[in-house]
Regions:
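Contiguous beta-strand/loop segments that form the cofactor/metal-binding neighborhood of enzyme cores
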Residues: 165-242, 276-292
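N-terminal Rossmann-like dinucleotide-binding module
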Residues: 1-45, 168
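Beta-loop-alpha module in the N-terminal Rossmann-like domain of NAD(P)-dependent dehydrogenases
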Residues: 16, 46-104
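C-terminal helix-rich "cap/oligomerization" subdomain common to oxidoreductases
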Residues: 63-68, 281-306
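Hydrophobic residues in well-ordered beta-strands that form the structural core
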Residues: 52, 89, 114-116, 140, ...
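Mid-domain beta-loop-alpha active-site segment that forms a flexible
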Residues: 117-124, 147-178, 191-192, 303
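A short helix->loop->beta-strand "cap" motif at the edges of active sites that frequently abuts
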Residues: 48, 83-85, 110-113, 204
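A contiguous active-site-proximal alpha/beta segment in oxidoreductase catalytic domains
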Residues: 94-151
Length: 306
């Protein structure tokens, strides 16, 4: 078991604390928060130590879990890395690319592992169809949320859209050719609604929309590729696959005839979705990568690129 500590005891921080306590891979030693009262309350609730300083905590742990506002990610991560501590950082990894690039360099220099909390990579609706995604040529994502003041320290791109950016970058094996985007601030001081079009060198195009001032919640991504359409509902944890398959013997849901007389058999399927906790899965995945000296599934490079 890895000795773990959590910095940040807010809403999401307490979720991480609870799950680290549940995991067989971690021994949660304690927590730290700038607000000592919040730290003591969380420590009492979860039966662990409330550290009086961040420096005291990183001297005793193997793994640091950073669940604080984005602006503080870099300073906490840098101190931990320089102390030889492996780091899990909630997304976005940093406030800017200069900071994340420095963490990339420091992690290599100090031989520690960093995983970034792009939790949708562990969403069972995505993992159920991940192996079906192959050379998509058009991708469309919508991530809409009702307003919540948590997360408004950064734009909707770093708050919400970054999840879909990471999913798309992990699914398209091609460099980016061009990005065009627009955004507007509605309530907060940073953009609350944004749209981006990402063009890849292999011809794939991704269109992303994110809003945190919506009347309803939605987290859907659709992949279009040769002979197959894949739809993922991250919110409701459902996936659908529609594909053309001439080799199947089952009765298709429909048969389409092209202008030249060719008949295409269309099949529909809904994969079984597991009931796993995606945050617990990503934390356990990080423990596996440390134990086996493997690259984390969502490492610092992925966080930096997103």
């Amino acid at each position: 078991m890895f000795k773990a500590g959590v910095v940040g005891c807010g809403h999401l921080g307490k979720i991480h604390i609870r799950l680290l306590n549940q995991s067989d891979n971690f021994d949660l030693l304690g927590v730290y928060d700038n607000d000592v009262n919040i730290s003591k309350k969380a420590a009492s609730e979860f039966g662990c130590k409330s550290y009086g300083s961040f420096e005291e905590m990183i001297d005793e742990i193997d793994v640091l879990d950073i669940v604080t506002p984005t602006s503080s990610h870099f300073s906490y991560a840098l101190k931990a890395i320089e102390n030889g501590v492996n780091v899990f950082i909630e997304k976005p990894v940093c406030s800017n690319t200069e900071e994340s690039l420095k963490l990339v360099e420091k992690s290599k220099l100090n031989n520690v592992k960093i995983q970034v909390g792009h939790v949708e990579r562990f969403n069972p609706a995505f993992t159920a169809v991940e192996n079906n995604i192959s050379k998509p040529m058009f991708i469309e994502s919508h991530r809409l949320a009702q307003f919540n003041p948590r997360g408004t320290d950064v734009s909707v791109v770093l708050d919400l859209m970054i999840h879909d950016i990471d999913i798309i970058l992990s699914s398209v094996d091609s460099p980016i050719k061009q990005i065009s985007s627009s955004g507007v601030s509605v309530i907060s001081d940073t953009p609350d609604i944004a749209n981006a079009r990402i063009e890849f060198e292999n011809g794939c195009v991704a269109n992303l929309t994110a809003s945190r001032v919506s009347l309803k919640n939605m987290r859907k991504t659709r992949f279009f590729q040769s002979g197959k359409y894949i739809s993922i509902d991250f919110l409701n944890r459902e996936s659908e696959i529609v594909e053309i398959d001439e080799k199947k013997s089952e009765i298709p849901i429909m048969t389409l005839e092209t202008s030249d007389g060719n008949k295409k058999k269309i099949y529909f399927s809904k994969p079984d979705i597991s009931e796993n906790n995606a945050i617990l899965e990503e934390l356990n995945s990080f423990a596996f990568s440390i134990k086996n000296n493997k690259r984390p599934k969502v490492d610092i490079y992925d966080g930096h690129n997103a």
